[in-house]
Amino acid sequence: MMDWLYRYPPLYPGILLKRYKRFFADVQLTSGEIVTAHCPNTGPMTGVSTPQSAVQLSKSDNLNRKLAYTLELIQVHDNEPTWVGINTFLPNRVVKLALAKYLFPELGEYSQIKGEVVYGLDKKSRVDFFLTGSDEERPIYLEVKNTTLSEGRLALFPDTETTRGQKHLRELMALLPLTRAVMLYFINRGDCTEFSPGDRTDPVYGKLLRDAIALGLEVLPCRFDISPEGIRYLGLAKLKI
């Protein structure tokens, strides 16, 4: 099996009591202590915030932090018991590591990786990654989307209406065909083998994605194995459009 792309720091198991005000989660640790952890996910976390679920927390030694613990993983039982990554700051870090290891052959050859490059019609957006290679190769604008919603083995994005995500699609479409535009869906759970746009949660996004694909947008629905030990890349999910 492929080596770990990312290893978690020591994690503390517990049971989720409730998540509230987006940024807070009350968790009972195995010791019985109840702590309030930071929830690094501003989305609705549909299907991945059920009370009484097993969770894993990291702990910071920074005494200036108001909350020492951070919610990192939650276990779901939609299929077999599966850990789901909650921390939305991790996908970009993991993708950067994967890009450095050239784990996505679909991207072809590139020699430079830049992050947070300004682009867009109003020059007010930043693309997650900008890849360049030889003069003969078109540059690649690559956007990463954290994906946790599922129906059975089917991963879905988004899990709620996302005007920001719609804007990103429109801006990537505007780059075509002079550059390559790639949408990488980071499937933050190992039990999904297929990917589709979440038409029920955001039909506008689904239509935009299909329109973008017709214009040449490339889609990489990337599967990742998530565990308290770390994160591994599993390859591409089947794209169902």
Curated annotation (Swiss-Prot):
Pfam families: SfsA, SfsA_N
First and last residue of the signal peptide: none
Gene3D superfamilies: 2.40.50.580, 3.40.1350.60
Family: Belongs to the SfsA family.
NCBIfam families in the cross-refs: sfsA
PANTHER family: SUGAR FERMENTATION STIMULATION PROTEIN A
This protein's name: Sugar fermentation stimulation protein homolog
Organism: Nostoc punctiforme (strain ATCC 29133 / PCC 73102)
